[in-house]
Regions:
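Basic nucleic-acid-binding interfaces
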Residues: 2-17, 22-94
Length: 94
């Protein structure tokens, strides 16, 4: 719905994708990768694919808070990407 404040708007609601490739060759690396996944889940992310987690956010401001949290969780090694899309864009994915 597009309308007054408080109404659901598919352009205001956001989805965050966290995609990552972390090294898991040594035991400490595996532990850091597992802890990163656990911390994502503690912050409300759910597994979409093995290294892709998603989370719904009620607004862009809420998404910004969760993006900052993820940034603080990122291990020193590996690659982590965050993609923010509107609910409308999320609904249009194939």
């Amino acid at each position: 719905m597009i309308g007054s404040q408080g109404a659901i708007n598919s352009y205001r609601l956001m989805w965050l994708y966290v995609m990552f490739d972390l090294p898991v060759e040594t035991k400490p690396q595996r532990k850091r990768a597992a802890q990163f996944r656990k911390n994502l889940m503690k912050d409300g992310f759910g597994m979409h694919q093995f290294s892709v987690y998603i989370r719904h956010c009620a607004s862009g401001e809420s998404a910004a808070v969760h993006i900052e949290r993820v940034k603080r969780l990122v291990p020193d090694e590996g690659m982590v990407s965050i993609l923010k899309v509107t609910d409308k864009q999320f609904g249009d994915t194939i």
